[in-house]
């Protein structure tokens, strides 16, 4: 179903010139770190993710960022329990806006889809969104428990020569947060 996750396609919010300048600096910062060696999840969170959320105004009220939120849930078969830590969770009034899962440099964002969907199933609402990132690559996920369906965005990367895809990532993130906040 092609229209299940159309929210990431647009129309998307417009970024300010100041936001674009910061996003360009964040891309360059990431590439410098990547060129100097392996980047851990913690480094991605410090040099890219936290500044991205700050630039978009998502670190202050009415939003809250929770780091390393523990989740535990049972699968419908009753025999399997999954548990783990969400790297970051953006919420507004107990409504999960975005689950953020970061992975180390060299890890494929696609490898984190199953883990991220597991976290999304434990969200307090039926529909949730997530962002998976290695710092270099970004993938958005939508999950709807009522429909037993999920969808993926295109993969966005900082290593493209065709501009700064972090701009698009920021726009999609703002769009999904706004949609989530409207439902809260």
Task: Locate predicted features.
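A short, conserved, highly charged catalytic patch centered on acidic carboxylates
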Residues: 1-127, 137-184
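Short hydrophobic alpha-helical segments used for membrane anchoring or interfacial signaling
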Residues: 132-134
């Amino acid at each position: 179903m092609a229209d299940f996750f159309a929210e990431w396609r647009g129309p998307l919010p417009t970024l300010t010139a100041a936001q674009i300048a910061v996003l360009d600096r964040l891309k360059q910062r990431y590439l410098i770190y990547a060129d100097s060696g392996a980047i851990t999840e913690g480094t991605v969170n410090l040099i890219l993710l936290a500044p991205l959320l700050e630039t978009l105004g998502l670190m202050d009220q009415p939003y809250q960022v929770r780091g390393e939120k523990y989740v535990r849930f049972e699968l419908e078969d009753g025999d399997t329990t999954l548990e783990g830590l969400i790297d970051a969770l953006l919420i507004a009034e107990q409504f999960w806006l975005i689950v953020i899962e970061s992975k180390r440099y060299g890890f494929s964002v696609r490898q984190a889809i199953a883990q991220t969907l597991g976290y999304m199933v434990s969200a307090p609402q039926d529909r949730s969104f997530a962002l998976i990132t290695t710092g270099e690559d970004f993938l958005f996920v939508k999950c709807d428990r009522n429909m037993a369906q999920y969808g993926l965005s295109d993969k966005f990367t900082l290593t493209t020569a065709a501009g700064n895809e972090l701009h698009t990532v920021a726009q999609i993130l703002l769009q999904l947060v706004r949609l989530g906040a409207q439902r809260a």
